[in-house]
Regions:
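C-terminal His-loop and adjacent cap/lid subdomain of alpha/beta-hydrolase
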Residues: 1-497
Length: 497
């Protein structure tokens, strides 16, 4: 089916008001994939509706196209806008509020009325968009308060991938997220990607996310937590490689990096379900207990000086971080082909764009390129013979350590949503293992059958419990979460009937 009208800002957000000339001279193109030629839509064939919001100087702007929108098609609207709102105040507010609560200062009398206990340590936790904000928060120097003190002792960006966000620039759009299929070249996923210093191959500039904090002696402890899905759809390798993707980056001593294998952007409940937005059923792996456990480890690190578990993430040096494709063909170290499963040709890689001389100093876009031929190189975790991630180079949930399926870190868009060669947004996939050798041979499936891996359901449960206990012993999982994971395993008894 075709949609008739779309909010150009997406997700119900407000847009920037077109000028009179911008409304009259707006241009619209369409194409199915990023590298396809842009096909102009005649101005008489599309309309912009500006709906005033009484409590904001930002309106809703709706776009309609004669004949409707085609599923999966990329529509690119360009118009002159006015009245940018103040951006970046949110990060200043976070800095000032946390500083006030922590140190008192001028707000001491008001704070005393709240009856709060003294604050000895502070940790910031941000999921997805909020994780990108925390990377920006550190890069822009907001971990130093107005009196030169450290605001957060610990910062935990979770599933942020390699990006920042449009949180602190003119004409900011904080929720807009760059992806493999859509939202290309918005100023989100930008150098520097790493917490330690690296050099941008396209400009020669050297920088780091923690550069300003290091200069002011306000560097926090950092835990960067992400899933294997971020490597495919959010440039997840760039925070721990050089921008060329040829060498591992050196992690500063204050930084730990945890890549949770066999998982998608959002934690699941462990139970498989039917395919929806992707060609494969959605990856159900439950990883939230691991991230929550690491939050406690962060507290112990900053408050009790107890070392957290060591970083665990795939690396170029040991061969566990690899190209998804070699010479345009599937890299067998990243995926062993399965009959009936289409492997993506696509992989998200942030593109470099020159936004003009004022971007670095003032965050003002004077030039907005529509195309680029310069890309930072992204890599993906290597897989084993069952196409699952490794327990030695990722923090691997027990469902994948002791598998009944391949927990795929990517998915392709469902055919009925169009552009089926592109990656589905922020989701992975799930492919059950063959039950027996006969089933594997019949399906030409090279993966190990369940019957060859486990002699019985009890054997499966025993191995699964051992995997859970290993995560607990190594410090990646709290004992209190073991029961949750074991309940999922016990629900798989039907597989062994």
């Amino acid at each position: 089916s075709t949609a008739e009208k779309l909010n150009i800002a997406g997700n119900g957000h407000l847009a920037y008001e077109p000028t009179a000339a911008g409304l009259a001279n707006a241009s619209l193109t369409r194409r199915l994939y990023q590298d396809d030629p842009r096909l102009p839509v005649e101005r008489s064939q599309f309309q912009l509706e500006v709906v005033v919001e009484n409590d904001s100087n930002q309106p809703i702007v709706n776009l309609s196209v004669a004949g409707g929108f085609q599923p999966g098609m990329l529509y690119e609207l360009v118009y002159e806008a006015r009245n940018p709102v103040l951006a970046g105040a949110g990060m200043a507010a976070i800095r000032d509020m946390v500083s006030a609560i922590r140190f008192g200062d001028d707000a001491a009398d008001e704070l005393s009325q709240l009856g709060l206990s003294d604050i000895e340590s502070t940790v910031a936790w941000g999921n997805s968009q909020s994780g990108r904000l925390l990377r920006q928060f550190m890069f822009d120097g907001f971990n130093e308060d107005l009196n030169g003190r450290k605001v957060f002792d610990g910062v935990i960006p979770v599933i942020a991938g390699g990006g920042f966000g449009m949180f602190n620039n003119r004409f900011a759009m904080p929720t807009r997220t760059n992806g493999q299929h859509s939202n290309h070249l918005y100023p989100n996923d930008l150098f520097p990607f790493t917490y330690g210093e690296s050099t941008d191959p396209f400009t020669g500039r050297t920088d780091s996310i923690l550069g300003k904090a290091r200069a002011s002696s306000t560097v926090p402890k950092v835990m960067h937590i992400q899933t294997s899905n971020e490597y495919w759809v959010r440039g997840g390798s760039l925070p721990h490689t050089n921008p060329q993707g040829t060498e591992d980056a050196v992690l500063p001593e204050e930084v730990r990096f945890y890549s949770i294998g066999g998982s998608q952007h959002g934690s699941g409940n462990g139970l498989p379900s039917a395919a929806t937005s992707g060609q494969l059923p959605r990856n159900p792996n439950m990883w939230a207990p691991i991230a929550d456990s690491l939050l406690v480890a962060m507290y112990d690190w900053i408050a009790n000086d107890k070392a957290p578990p060591p970083s665990r993430y795939p690396q170029i040096a040991d061969g566990s971080l690899v190209p998804a494709h070699i010479d345009g063909r599937i890299n067998s170290r990243a995926w062993n082909q399965l009959s009936g499963v289409t492997h993506p040709d696509a992989l998200y890689a942030p593109g470099f764009a020159n936004y003009g001389d004022r971007w670095i100093t003032d965050r003002i876009v004077d030039i907005h390129p529509l195309t680029t031929d310069m890309y930072y190189r992204t890599l993906v975790p290597a897989v084993n013979s069952n196409n699952n991630d490794s327990a030695t180079t990722t923090v691997l949930p027990p469902l994948t350590q002791v598998p009944l399926a391949t927990f795929v870190p990517w998915n392709l868009r469902a055919v009925n949503t169009g552009a089926e060669k592109s990656l589905a947004r922020l989701v992975g996939g799930y492919i059950p293992l063959p039950a027996s050798m006969g089933a594997a041979e019949q399906a030409s499936d090279p993966r190990t059958p369940i019957a060859a891996m486990y002699s019985s359901f009890s054997d499966y449960l025993s191995l699964y419990e051992s995997a859970s206990d290993s995560l607990i012993r190594e410090g990646y999982l709290l004992q209190g979460f073991k029961q949750t994971y074991m309940d999922i395993a016990r629900s798989n008894d039907f597989v062994f009937d």
